[in-house]
């Protein structure tokens, strides 16, 4: 029987130059594996707690030495000797050890790092790819990437309100071809922006951060780039938005669109989305309304839920009980999956199973503060999520996930790129 021999953590850096945790697990056969925990910029207030030191003399208060110490002392002491391949049991032990609903004691960053490292070590010890260990024989589907090629909101210092403008390469036979087309669109967009004397500096997730005058201009620019790159807009490559509207809302559920110089209520914002969807081939909108605007979400879902994908990120925070509330209220039809919002691999799996049972689409997702760790690429294939959000075709912490998916597609040989089939349900 494989057991846990040692657990330890180290403070390392993420892609924004902020500290994060690298957790390592060593098994009884001396197999060792590590995992680096990501961190978000726009975070839902119901997310599990990311434990920071708040010591202003180190990293402006963002150090994670306390979380590392929790791994190196408390967590280590309680996990040594446990069966390594009993992921659910170990994750439950971590949850009980913390004793709070949101990991306020140990820190979700401490707990998730250990949970990820354990899964990776167990897969390695059994000589299995991580996607096969987590997903079994049914792990066969390569996800459609949602590539963030123009950044706004909290991910960039510009005048665009919406946080992410994405492309989805649906009309291709393989992940490799879909990624190639996306990269070509990205480079074509750069040339177009250069030609308009727009900034081509990039945001946290590798997308460009130009100073457009309003929120529609990025849609025009991306549409142009797709067609100029030689692809059919809407058929081969569609558009998607992450509005991150919890960053735009005030206490009265009015949404401040500075790029448009408008203040809209929920119904007016939904009407605005309907105009955009009618004019552009937008197939997905994430966080179209605030995480607390349940009434607005119900209206959005009624108005657009049969037409496009409506993704809850801040709304659901990868939490099964909150998702259940959304299901009961007929809110949204898809959920963003971010393991660090909930705390462990097993809790993430629970949320995905609930979503799939109720025909909600699942989108595996990175965070804006990332690393070279490619865990979510394997996780997306393991759970056949069908979609993955992991940034643009720039910045090595984003490319690490895409390169891992290329490896997986090559290994699977008979793997399926879901492509056009993604939105053919209901």
Curated annotation (Swiss-Prot):
The cross-references to InterPro entries, in alphabetical order and at most eight, read: Enolase (IPR000941), Enolase-like_C_sf (IPR036849), Enolase-like_N (IPR029017), Enolase_C (IPR020810), Enolase_CS (IPR020809), Enolase_N (IPR020811)
Q: Among its keywords, does the record have Lyase? A: yes
Any idea which GO molecular function terms this record carries?
Answer: magnesium ion binding; phosphopyruvate hydratase activity
Main enzyme class: lyase
Which cofactors are named for this entry?
Mg(2+)
Q: Which domain of life is it from?
A: Bacteria
- What protein name applies here? Enolase
